[in-house]
Amino acid sequence: MWFKNLTLYRFNKPFSIETEALETALADFTFSPCGSQDVSKFGFSNALGKQGSTLVHSANNRHLICVTKEEKILPGQVIKESLEEKVAQIEDEENRKLAKKEKDALKDEIITSLLPRAFSRRSQTRALILPELEMILVDSSSATKAEELLALLRKALGSLPVIPLSFKAPVEANLTQWLKDGSAPLPFEMQDEAELKSAADEGGIVRFKQQDLKEDEVLAHLETGKEVHKLALHFGQSIALLLQSDASVKRLKFSEEFRAGNDELGNEDPMARLDADFALMGSELVALMHALVSALGGLEETQA
């Protein structure tokens, strides 16, 4: 349940919803496994996984939701070889070349025949709806997966007025200034990893890992016009993260000390522990968002 990445969105119109209403809306779009002829299936599933029983898990008016996607695995090479074999057989028997339309129809037939025997894979993506911040945080490093989740949520609710999070000043401008200053605004602390890019479209990219970012070797690249597009940070003592110029957060990791905050509850009641951990995570992510918006100079104004 602990989030590992953040793709960030904000509401551009006032938004609020009660847990029960959200649960009811999602219920019409619950996940069901692939049938024999399904290529993929996508829908909402229990927010807390196997331990949970609801599509929405809420605490302090913060709502956790989850989508599950199942996809049949059909190797392209297998389809290609089967198609070539079938085309060659028919062309030999009928002594003619098949048209593209005929080949496409054969390909569809092959896929249909392979689907019932194909393996499948499942993936899950969670999101945290934060009405207090007018934000949605999606636990995914993929913008495509985040947009898939939001598209299904929009379909379930009828409308979902969200846009990607954007700031008054370019994120890379702030990250570059922090590197020049040798420190990030509190409560953030720079770590030992960064990626610098030239402002030119075809300019160079330089990556530093396990390196003191205050050294002249690093700063020299700023003098040549490069900007910081990725920067490893600590948020207080609780979270390590990699902040990117598109305002996404990768490699989000809560410290062991922070995660141990509910250890006194034990694990005898898994649901009670999950509920407490969710409340703990939600509160810290809200604090992180407040600090991030402040450190980056505020959000860009939106048209209501």
From Swiss-Prot:
Major subcellular location class: cytoplasm
Pfam name, any one: RdgC
Gene this protein is translated from: rdgC
Keywords assigned: Cytoplasm, DNA recombination
Similarity comment: family membership: Belongs to the RdgC family.
HAMAP family per UniProt: RdgC
InterPro entries, sorted: RdgC
Domain of life: Bacteria
CC per GO annotation: bacterial nucleoid; cytoplasm
Function: May be involved in recombination.
Official protein name in the record: Recombination-associated protein RdgC
Compartment list: Cytoplasm, Nucleoid
GO BP annotations, alphabetical order: DNA recombination; regulation of DNA recombination
Molecular functions per Gene Ontology: double-stranded DNA binding
